[in-house]
Amino acid sequence: MEKVTKNVYAETKVRGCNPAYVVTSSGVVIIDTPQLPTHAVRMRKEAESHGEIKYLINTEYHVDHIFGNYYFRGAGIVVAHADTANNFMTVTPEINPYEYAHEAIPTDDPEGEKIWPDEKTYFEDPNRPTIIFKGDLTIRLGDHSFELIHTPGHTPGQLAVYIPEERVAVVGDTIFNGVQTWLYASDVDQWIESLDRLKKLDVDKIVPGHGPVCTKHELDVQKAFLLEWIAAVQSAIGRGLSKEDCVRHIKDSEFSKRFSVDIGQEYMLDHVIE
């Protein structure tokens, strides 16, 4: 995993989210877990080489941030916002997150099939959150503090984790850096407000949900992208297009092709932009 600062590590180059961990004087804090089984097992082993895992924070409920919790059972207390806990691995008519996660195995993690749980076994204990809260929460562990900031927009229970001692924020999918932004079921107005809130943090580096480690500049880039997207949708609505035609129009435009879709998500483009 990439060493972001002296005590912060993140993975930014595999299918799924950018999971991270932070080493403190009293143990390790995990922030999101890998979607791919072998990566989850490897991350746990690497993190535990620095000390006991005390907390696992999930920044949202999308499967690429939480599926790997299964491989961290017995390793720390799982923490999440109430809206994330309420939607944790929920099967909907649109998507079964368990099946979606398994689709990545043949192409991205064939060795993961050997440690893949059947669906019944998985749902018996997917390692759900047990510290559940609304608003913000601060966790202190050893010589570090972790400010869990509610940043709704991408999902209702979205969190950013600010570690002031490292001058780093792990912001989850509030930033997509250099890859197509996943807008499915998002509240873009809330998202913009959350970006403005994160601008106030005193940080040198940001770990985004997808794409390379970045700086506060990418908060402005993400905001500009969302504002431009709103304008494109408003323009399509003003021309009398239906929702379906609006999605089709934007999908076929240069605007939606500005960034590539993140690793392994090419076939999900309709969900990304809808």
Predicted regions and their residues:
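Residue-level detector of beta-strand structural context in well-folded domains
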Residues: N18-A20, I131, G135-L137, L159
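Active-site HxH/HxHxD metal-binding segment of metal-dependent hydrolases
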Residues: V41, K45-K134, T138, A231
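Short loop/helix-cap segments at secondary-structure boundaries that form the rim of catalytic
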Residues: V23, N69-G74, L141-G142, Y162
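Divalent metal-coordination and catalytic microenvironments
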Residues: N7, V22, D32, A47, ...
